[in-house]
């Protein structure tokens, strides 16, 4: 120590004094310094030689000691976030004023209307919102709430939504799964069958109506979006967060309490805490404290080198930070001075633990509450644009020019242009987020800050990133928000912009337009989303505890890991408000490796997503499909043919006679169109007519099938092998849509009857098309035994046999099938009213038949056995 003291006594000091933040940013730490002439620092004399150890970020919780039965408030202390002792939560005063309440629906929440609620379980809800009272356009509005989400209630509104008068769960789910939701509303066509679809036996299909649904307007602080929660939304809510309720039992560290409980909160020291030799306030067992707020500050650790040993101390980087002189040999790069610095550092390393010093409990100084109530003021101070001799980088520091020493050193965010009136001592929290648009923001010329020593230019307007897009809301919500005229809600997820600077971010200063008060004067770490990531701020603007680091800021000691000073990756390009000039940035490239961000990296910019539709078909569909929005047989697996071009035509068949809706003809139909069927030997003359229709006709399954020999092939196989009209093959054939040809099979006579057109629905792969045929009367000789099933004639319904594959049945054939298995006419008429064809029929379950259709057990058993292949032996 004697040798070290002799070396220190022989040091010669620079003539000028430098700001502490400039020394920290430009000098290799640790370094030696002493107070400049005329400067004062508490606990430091003019003769003391200081070892500037490191620059650190301290995050502490401000607490009041509670005495005399919680009524007398004692001194205010700072408890570091890394304090190892544990605390137990006491019964809070707010629990007496506002007892914990639980809700099971949004309607219950609206009836009480507390200031804020917390979601106790994940909730997903969906509602169909109509754009207007006289508009058919609608959009599905769905949202998801996560457990622990904090919602601030803002008001109530009503939205127009599409409701259904009555709806059955299982049958509705089946129709939606098949894409046949239109059948629910009775929009299958214009015929009389759909007119009575809403009033059938056993609860017919539901008809959509527009209704006003009351909603609760909330702000979700996790996503920073407003929500409209319908009253009918069910879920568990509470006035306390689930994490806070879990914290009522057990003992917890300060960090755990801050992350999960809304401040202020009263705590008790349940057991004897560990001792720290640097503690300036003893925390004893049984003491009670009120945790008030969280604050973050930048401090410079130092040691006064004295004969009795190093005395640790720290300086807050405020506007009145004292100036220090540096050894002249250090500025000139004298190796003897550098060796003296290394010896001093090794001497202090054995006698000083910076980590323990950083976690000590101290009494909060009174001036800190006044001068540094907001952590945005506790930051690295940037020098004003003076001292042109410092524009050299990274060479030795030059003293300030004479004659300018009387200028007060202030932070450059408001010191570049002198103002007649002093700025307010505190920036309101809402003001930080109001009026952030590019208009009206004229940035003063950049000063000589820690990194860039560039030339100052004229005032210029800095381009700023546009604000994030507004999340999608209904018109009613927008109108309600306009009526509420609520104060601006600051985003709690972070500042949203990346900064890479050696000093904490400084918000732009704006003239205060009107006093705007925060809805809560005590925003906590939990309620403000500090736990969401790096760079996030508490209600008072303090950084996340995750960005707190015990490692020094630009420290280059051997045991200090600079890379751990911030665990976040370097952000992208700088925002224009902190971007240094290109020339000055090039000068400071060697120093950029030592400068780490004190407040962590940026928070990712929030993007908004509108609600996607519930189901998007992979193939194009007509907007107003008559029988449901989707056709189960018209997917990409089925090749397109003539039926694909006809699939959008309206089709309604209910019963033996069907009437068409709009007069729609899918092709150049002539009055002579008819179904024609003949033995294979008689089909050759009609093959020449295929030139009238350029595309091959897919083989349909004749709804009036005449025999066992003409049962259809599977739909997929048949649709993949189209045959031209007139090709020999089993089953009936459809004549081309064109002018009438001379077609005279043996003994078959067609008598034209002037009756209106009626659609004959194509079945199987051609579902959805409609052919309009003239009503005629076919007469022919009785089918001979050798003709078998190929003879064409009108057979009575009693001889009709259902096919093996029921999925291709038409509405009429479903009715025939029900009569075939002996069901009553009221069941048959109910199935006809519900417009159940084969594709729906084969997917009916026992639950749907019994619960939704209210059929008897015998009827349910018959239908289920029939679907599975049972046929009555008649």
Swiss-Prot record:
In this chain, composition skew of type Polar residues spans 575-585
* Taxonomic path: Eukaryota, Metazoa, Chordata, Craniata, Vertebrata
Superkingdom of the organism of origin:
Eukaryota
Q: Which UniProt keywords apply?
A: Phosphoprotein
Question: Compositional bias (Low complexity) spans?
Answer: 388-403, 518-545, 632-650, 658-691
Q: PANTHER family this protein is in? A: GRB2-ASSOCIATED AND REGULATOR OF MAPK PROTEIN 2, GRB2-ASSOCIATED AND REGULATOR OF MAPK PROTEIN FAMILY MEMBER
Asked if Phosphoprotein is a keyword of the record, the answer is yes
Give me the disulphide-bonded residues: none
CABIT: where is this region? 12-339
Show where the SAM domain sits.
807-871
The record's InterPro entries line, in alphabetical order, gives: CABIT_dom (IPR025946), GAREM (IPR052281), SAM/pointed_sf (IPR013761)
- Phosphoserine occurs at 735
Example GO biological process:
social behavior
* Name by which UniProt lists this protein: GRB2-associated and regulator of MAPK protein 2
Q: Which organism is it from?
A: Homo sapiens (Human)
Gly residues biased stretches: 188-206
Q: What biological function has been recorded for the protein in this entry?
A: Probable adapter protein that may provide a link between cell surface epidermal growth factor receptor and the MAPK/ERK signaling pathway.
> Where are the annotated segments for Disordered?
188-207, 388-422, 437-545, 563-598, 625-742
Family from the record? Belongs to the GAREM family.
Membrane spanning residue stretches: none
């Amino acid at each position: 120590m004697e040798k070290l003291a002799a070396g220190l006594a022989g040091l010669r000091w620079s003539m000028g004094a430098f700001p502490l933040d400039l020394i920290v940013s430009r000098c290799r730490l640790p370094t030696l310094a002493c107070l400049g002439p005329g400067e004062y620092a508490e606990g430091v004399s003019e003769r003391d030689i200081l070892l500037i150890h490191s620059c650190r970020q301290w995050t502490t919780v401000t607490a009041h000691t509670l005495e005399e039965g919680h009524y007398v408030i004692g001194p205010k202390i700072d408890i570091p976030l890394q304090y190892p002792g544990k605390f137990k939560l006491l019964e809070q005063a707010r629990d007496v004023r506002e007892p914990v309440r639980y809700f099971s629906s949004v309607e219950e929440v609206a009836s009480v209307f507390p200031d804020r609620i917390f979601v106790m379980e994940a909730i997903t809800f969906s509602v169909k919102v109509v754009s207007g009272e006289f508009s058919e356009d609608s959009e599905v509005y769905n949202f998801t709430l996560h457990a622990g989400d904090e919602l601030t209630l803002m008001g109530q509104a009503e939205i127009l939504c599409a409701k259904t008068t009555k709806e059955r769960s299982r049958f509705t789910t089946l129709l939606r799964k098949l894409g046949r939701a239109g059948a629910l509303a009775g929009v299958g066509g214009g015929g009389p069958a759909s007119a009575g679809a809403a009033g059938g036996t056993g609860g017919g299909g539901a008809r959509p109506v527009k209704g006003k649904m009351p909603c609760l307007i909330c702000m979700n602080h996790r996503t920073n979006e407003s929500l409209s929660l319908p009253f009918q939304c069910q879920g568990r809510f509470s006035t306390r967060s689930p994490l806070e309720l879990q914290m009522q039992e057990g003992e917890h560290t300060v960090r755990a309490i801050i992350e999960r409980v809304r401040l202020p909160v009263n705590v008790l020291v349940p057991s004897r805490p560990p001792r720290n030799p640097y503690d300036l306030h003893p925390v004893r067992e049984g003491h009670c404290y009120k945790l008030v707020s969280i604050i973050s500050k930048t401090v410079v650790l130092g040691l006064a080198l004295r004969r009795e040993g190093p005395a640790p101390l720290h300086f807050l980087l405020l506007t009145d930070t004292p100036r220090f002189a540096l050894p002249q040999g250090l500025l000139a790069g004298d190796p003897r001075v550098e060796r003296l610095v290394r010896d001093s550092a090794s001497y202090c390393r054995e006698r000083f633990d910076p980590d323990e010093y950083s976690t000590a409990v101290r009494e909060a100084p009174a001036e800190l509450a006044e001068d540094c109530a907001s952590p945005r003021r506790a930051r690295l101070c940037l020098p004003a644009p003076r001292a042109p001799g410092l524009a050299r980088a990274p060479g030795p520091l030059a003293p300030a020019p004479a004659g300018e020493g009387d200028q007060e050193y202030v932070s450059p965010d408001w010191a570049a242009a002198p103002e007649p009136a002093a700025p307010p001592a505190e920036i309101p929290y809402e003001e930080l987020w109001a009026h952030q648009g590019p208009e009206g923001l004229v940035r003063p010329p950049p000063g000589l800050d820690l990194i860039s020593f560039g030339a100052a230019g004229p005032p210029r307007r800095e381009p700023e990133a546009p604000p994030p897009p507004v999340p999608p809301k209904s018109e009613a919500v927008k109108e309600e928000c306009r009526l509420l005229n609520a104060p601006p809600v600051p985003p709690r997820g972070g500042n949203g912009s990346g900064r890479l600077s050696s000093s904490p971010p400084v918000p732009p200063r704006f003239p205060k337009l009107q006093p705007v008060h925060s809805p809560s004067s005590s925003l906590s770490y939990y309620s403000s989303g500090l736990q969401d990531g790096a760079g996030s701020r508490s209600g008072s603007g303090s950084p996340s505890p995750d960005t707190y680091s015990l490692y020094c800021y630009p420290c280059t000691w051997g045991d200090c890991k600079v890379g751990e000073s911030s665990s976040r990756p370097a952000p992208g390009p700088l925002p224009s408000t902190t971007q240094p000039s290109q020339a000055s940035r090039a000068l400071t490239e060697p120093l950029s490796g030592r400068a780490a961000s004190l407040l962590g990296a940026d928070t990712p910019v929030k993007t908004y997503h509108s609600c996607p539709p519930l189901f998007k078909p992979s193939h194009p569909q007509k907007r107003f499909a008559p029988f449901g929005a989707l056709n189960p047989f018209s997917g990409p697996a089925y090749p397109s043919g003539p039926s694909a071009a006809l699939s959008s035509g309206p089709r309604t068949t209910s019963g033996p006679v069907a009437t068409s809706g709009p007069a729609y003809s899918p092709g150049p139909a002539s009055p002579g169109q008819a179904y024609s069927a003949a033995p294979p030997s008689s089909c050759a003359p009609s093959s020449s007519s295929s030139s009238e229709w350029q595309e091959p006709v897919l083989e349909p399954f004749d709804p009036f099938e005449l025999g066992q020999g003409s049962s259809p092939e599977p739909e997929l196989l048949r649709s993949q092998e189209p045959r031209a009209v007139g090709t020999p093959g089993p089953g009936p054939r459809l004549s081309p849509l064109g002018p009438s040809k001379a077609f005279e099979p043996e003994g078959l006579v067609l008598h034209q009857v002037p009756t209106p057109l009626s659609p004959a629905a194509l079945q199987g792969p051609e579902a959805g098309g409609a052919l309009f045929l003239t009503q005629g009367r076919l007469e022919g000789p009785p089918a001979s035994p050798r003709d078998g099933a190929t003879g064409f004639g009108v057979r009575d319904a009693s001889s009709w046999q259902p096919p093996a594959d029921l999925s291709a049945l038409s509405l009429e054939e479903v009715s025939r099938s029900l009569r075939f298995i002996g069901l009553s006419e009221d069941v048959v008429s109910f199935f006809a009213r519900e417009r159940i064809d084969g594709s729906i029929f084969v997917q009916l379950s026992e639950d749907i038949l019994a619960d939704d259709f209210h059929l008897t057990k015998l009827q349910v058993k018959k239908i289920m056995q029939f679907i599975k292949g049972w046929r009555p032996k008649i």
